[in-house]
Amino acid sequence: MHLQLKSHMTISAPAEKVWCILAHDFSTIGQWASAIPASQAVPDLSAPSGAQVGGRVCTTAVRGFADVQETFTSYDEPSMRFAYQATEGRPWFLKHAENHWAVHSLGPHTSLVEVQAEIDMNLFPGLFLAPLLKLQMGRVGAQTLEELKYYAERDQVHPRKLKAQQKQVQKEAPVRARH
């Protein structure tokens, strides 16, 4: 069973700046995206030509996903396009999950970001979960683009990310107090 989700966002920032956030700083998505409490580079993956890293591990705030390793499948610096797939940490019912990103210049201070997610699921329980997964992934994708826009345009994280960070600190505080 195959799902495809597409989205786009116009951002009032130069394409080069947005590309830097998405591609050059690929491993630091956890600094600005609320669905990703933390992220880091995978040091033992070789980086494609032009990329800083070969992949990242993201701790997610999305139910059903634990730490997900994402590995570049393509990277094209001149055309500002890349794709990556979740290679580890996917829920058992997902056979394949891949995202394609492209950044286009619409002028010196405006860019367009396009995202396409491709997901292949097992027929069971995919048939039943597909509508919920599509809804959840669509919502998370829209929020991530909104947070990217905010981050690129204002050089600061979205209030939703700040709130998520505060929740994470509060969640960890009782654990630290017990030790």
Q: Could you say what each language-model-derived stretch is?
A:
Residues 1-3, 64, 95, 109:
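Residue-level preference for beta-strand/loop junctions
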Residues 30, 40-92, 112, 143-166, ...:
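Glycine-rich portal/gate segments that line the openings of hydrophobic small-molecule binding cavities
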Residues 35-43, 59, 96, 103-104:
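Hydrophobic, well-ordered secondary-structure segments
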Residues 86-143, 150, 159:
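Beta-strand/loop substructures that line and gate deep hydrophobic ligand-binding cavities in soluble
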